[in-house]
Amino acid sequence: MEEYYMKLALDLAKQGEGQTESNPLVGAVVVKDGQIVGMGAHLKYGEAHAEVHAIHMAGAHAEGADIYVTLEPCSHYGKTPPCAELIINSGIKRVFVAMRDPNPLVAGRGISMMKEAGIEVREGILADQAERLNEKFLHFMRTGLPYVTLKAAASLDGKIATSTGDSKWITSEAARQDAQQYRKTHQSILVGVGTVKADNPSLTCRLPNVTKQPVRVILDTVLSIPEDAKVICDQIAPTWIFTTARADEEKKKRLSAFGVNIFTLETERIQIPDVLKILAEEGIMSVYVEGGSAVHGSFVKEGCFQEIIFYFAPKLIGGTHAPSLISGEGFQSMKDVPLLQFTDITQIGRDIKLTAKPTKE
């Protein structure tokens, strides 16, 4: 039954996807005498944590009960008081934790607090599932850098447009709708200025009940972005532009007047590691890279990605000059080519979605 209750807690945690910002997804279930007496999830950044909801629901039944939590209860004061302290004061006798929190502010302290208070703590139940649930948060806490997902849609022969630049639409409506979920679960969407010029996208999540839009990140070496682009004018979501010392200072001022954040790198070209470092400093834990092909090529060349999600349509575009999924310098030797492991292959309508992650095996 321990795995059953933890699985329920994991399912509850998913309710907060796309809404907890820099906080992890957490679910909690309180059980007493074989009966569930409390449940909760962290649903929105700044609001009550999962343990708070579950214990408040349990009320007096929390005394002598067990609680199942998908991540180690916090031990510090942040937007809310520490959950470990709440658990201690509630009279709960046993705590089942899927995994420890690598956040330096927690990192075992929550577990230590509860043990010192005489509470029995068991760890590791469905730890792998808990790890997958919060892979973006955990990657950020362990590396100090955002979790990067590369997304693209292409024909079966790997083309993202015809030789004339026509790309609407390669994949089906079902595939395009599926891709929207990842805009919701990432804190930022990143594209090159070429994509802005070609498609004039809004780069927003169009799913219902989205409480906060992801930050729109544009890579633009010489600040050539059109000033009437949607990402500049619509004010729906924040827009951040990374440029270089080659950018026009007057244009910077005009864009800033629109509320655009300009980050100027002191280099001739935009270096992906520099961009990711700055995004991390700004609190961005996850980046959804939508292209174009040169941008994808830069991320791949630098090894700056944790996951790819590619949609393939059963179409053959052909053409030497039709753009491919990934362009740029590429690799000169096969020994340098990154090896990926497929983690999911799904058919969506007539299209195929491939998900893969880098592996050393």
Swiss-Prot record:
The active site is at residue 51. Residues 145-361 are annotated as: Reductase. It holds the Pfam family dCMP_cyt_deam_1. Its cofactor is Zn(2+). InterPro entries: APOBEC/CMP_deaminase_Zn-bd, CMP_dCMP_dom, Cytidine_deaminase-like, DHFR-like_dom_sf, Eubact_RibD, RibD_C, RibDG_C, Riboflavin_Biosynth_HTPR. Zn(2+) binds at residues 49, 74, 83. Pathway: Cofactor biosynthesis; riboflavin biosynthesis; 5-amino-6-(D-ribitylamino)uracil from GTP: step 2/4; Cofactor biosynthesis; riboflavin biosynthesis; 5-amino-6-(D-ribitylamino)uracil from GTP: step 3/4. Substrate binds at residues 167, 183, 203, 206, 290. NADP(+) binds at residues 153, 169, 195, 199, 221, 292-298. One of its GO terms (biological process) is riboflavin biosynthetic process. It comes from the Bacteria. In the N-terminal section; belongs to the cytidine and deoxycytidylate deaminase family. In the C-terminal section; belongs to the HTP reductase family. Converts 2,5-diamino-6-(ribosylamino)-4(3h)-pyrimidinone 5'-phosphate into 5-amino-6-(ribosylamino)-2,4(1h,3h)-pyrimidinedione 5'-phosphate. Homotetramer. This is Riboflavin biosynthesis protein RibD. It comes from Bacillus subtilis (strain 168). The gene is ribD.
